Amino acid sequence: MLLSDVDIQAALEDKLIQIDPFDPQMLQPASLDIRLSRYFRLFNNHTYAYIDPAEPQEALTRLVEVAENQAFVLHPGEFILGSTCETVSLSNDLAARLEGKSSLGRLGLLTHSTAGFIDPGFSGQITLELGNVATLPIKLWPGMKIGQLCFFQLSSPAKNAYGSPVCASRYQGQRGPTASLSHQHFYRARFTEIGL
């Protein structure tokens, strides 16, 4: 079930959803707007010949901090990591979905490339996968509305929520734009093992 503004407000009051800092003006009819921090991770395109998700590549990205009164210019075809200002914490019976803002989508800004789902039990700032598919550069201002979170009630609380020892929760407690940790617990099925 998708939560309405009434349900989101009640979940905030009951601390089933925790948003820090919380601004009541960010509450929408069925979502909560989130804002862009001033930290970005840029890809070092000349450091590696390719990206290998199975291997650690610590120098693949570098952290950049933009002054509060300055914009970060995202060029056409460029892909960077950003972060929300807000730290988001979810109870074991709520999940969330990150969606872009319609007005920014109409300018060619992608807020996330594929990873818009936030598991129950997650706590941390949300890393944004920002891409410019327009033909002109886009200015990204720290503090601007960058997306919205929709919240969903689970049919029952998760037995092993994000952050539990059973899950490979690589990003629990993340602060700022967090580079990929895909090499940790990397899984690749062997076709002979799965009967293909």
Swiss-Prot record:
One GO-annotated biological process of the protein: nucleobase-containing small molecule interconversion
Record InterPro entries: dCTP_deaminase, dUTPase-like_sf, dUTPase_trimeric
Catalytic activity: dCTP + 2 H2O = dUMP + NH4(+) + diphosphate
Sequence positions that bind dCTP: 101-106, 119, 127-129, 148, 162, 174
Source superkingdom: Bacteria
Keywords of this entry: Hydrolase, Nucleotide metabolism, Nucleotide-binding
Family: Belongs to the dCTP deaminase family.
Any Pfam family the entry gives: DCD
Protein's UniProt name: dCTP deaminase, dUMP-forming
Native source species: Tropheryma whipplei (strain Twist) (Whipple's bacillus)
